[in-house]
Amino acid sequence: MKQLIITADDFGLSSGVNAAVEQGWRDGILTCASIMPGATAFDQALTIARRNPGLQVGLHLTLVQGKAVLPSSQIPDLVNEAGEFSNNPVACGMRYFFDKGLYKQLKQEIEAQIQRVVDSGIPLSHIDGHLNIHLHPTVFAFLTELMPRYGITSFRLSRERLCHNLRFDRERRAGKTIERIIFGALANHARPILKELGIRYAGEVKGVLNSGRMTEGYILQIIEGLSDGLTELYFHPGILPDTEITRRMPDYRHADELAAIISPRIKQRVAELNIGLENYRGDRKEYA
């Protein structure tokens, strides 16, 4: 049996993202959304989540290219005076690994992001990360301590088959190869620890190598070759015009990704292939 988790990232980033998430849940195959607690439209995202209780919400942990939850005075080595993390993921990754002086502030911010969602009353069941920062070895070590404490039972294990991806999209071959090596190694490190903790994860995650380009045509191709078991597809849907979306991700095809989520062709093909739609809790979504 094949099952699909369909997730929208960046929930709370902007009104355009939030509107797309709600439309994807109501009219499409979306089953989950990953929320950014420090983002400007976080409160609006909570309102949408409350009026759509079947939509499962996870934490989109943000430690790069975004805003912190804690005040800058409390984590001055992580953010600038405006409370913003660096926009350079490589520099962040190196600092978070080698600079042990950051560890206390880093753990405080990670827990604060979890706590902000928990305090909202929205059930929080899974964790992923902006630019997959949740797999960073230092960050992951803190998460393995915090997830059991907060009852978080699922985790995005960001690994994707390179050969399957390149069969349908041969752009960025060098970049995808590097990403596959890096995230593959990080996933291999995390997997046995997640197993030991009893944390659920999908066998494969689609969206790692085609982030921002999860279009209808691409999705129709890749669902034909899904592995048995649980697969997650993650998207970055948005409704334009939206200055926050285009400022942060000018090359992402947000409208096309929303179109894929609500595509009647994709919904029909998923049903024909007898692929189940569910969230990380295992709740099934019925075909409309």
Language-model regions, residue ranges each:
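Conserved strand-turn element in the central/C-terminal portion of the radical SAM core barrel
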Residues: G129
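DG-centered beta-turn motif at the end of beta-strands
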Residues: A8-F11
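Terminal accessory/targeting
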Residues: K2-I5, S15-H126, P137-A288
